[in-house]
Swiss-Prot record:
Places the protein is found: Cytoplasm
Protein name (Swiss-Prot/TrEMBL): Urease accessory protein UreE
GO molecular function: nickel cation binding; unfolded protein binding
UniProt GO cellular component terms: cytoplasm
Keyword presence, tRNA processing: no
GO terms for biological process, alphabetical: protein folding; protein-containing complex assembly; urea metabolic process
Domain of life per record: Bacteria
InterPro entries assigned to the protein according to its UniProt record, in alphabetical order: UreE, UreE_C_dom, UreE_N, UreE_N_sf
Pfam families for the chain: UreE_C, UreE_N
Family recorded in the similarity comment: Belongs to the UreE family.
Metal-binding among keywords: no
Length: 174
């Protein structure tokens, strides 16, 4: 089966009369635009999205839908460090450390907590900085990922000049 676009999300439709088949993926695979996937019922899916979702695939995204069957994305749970800073300077230290480690950061609106995939170095930093956290087994959904919506500094635009030349010389040779 070939999938070229996401139809919607199961949360937005009534799927009580449909056979639900799930494609399980890890949170870090949700940004993929092209993938070969297998559903729990053995359906092979060649996903080649014409346009990648803005923030990635979400839990419950619909890959296929007809009158009898629906195939959805199911993001696998993983170990997560959950943090709820109580003061602005704790938040600043936390964001600095997470950014310094290049670890993605998620915000769970239901629990009002920041979440990061479990990494031992981050846990050690949180302990050393006395920042309260708990380790939980949960789903990291793309819709909850904190992203920079615009580039802080745009990439330089390089233009090759037709008058550009390089001369290489070696010292000491006559």
């Amino acid at each position: 089966m070939r999938v070229e676009h996401i139809i919607g999300n199961i949360k937005d439709i009534d799927a009580t009369h449909l056979d639900i088949d799930e494609v399980q993926i890890a949170w870090y695979d949700t940004k993929k635009k092209i993938a070969r996937l297998n559903s729990q019922n053995g359906q092979v899916i060649a996903m080649k999205l014409a346009q990648a979702p803005k923030y990635g695939l979400n839990n419950g995204d619909i890959l296929f839908l007809d009158e009898h069957k629906i195939i959805i994305i199911s993001i696998l749970p993983t170990w997560v460090l959950c943090m709820k800073p109580t003061h602005w300077h704790t938040m600043a230290r936390l964001c600095y450390e997470i950014g310094n480690l290049h670890i993605p950061l998620f915000y769970n609106k239901d629990t009002m907590k920041l979440q990061a995939p479990f990494e031992q170095p981050l846990q050690r930093i949180l302990e050393k900085q006395s920042i309260a956290f708990e380790k939980k087994w949960c789903v990291l959904d793309s819709k909850d990922r904190i992203n920079i919506t615009y580039p802080i500094a745009s990439e330089p635009k390089l233009i090759q000049s037709p008058h550009f030349s390089i001369k290489i010389t070696q010292k000491g040779l006559n």
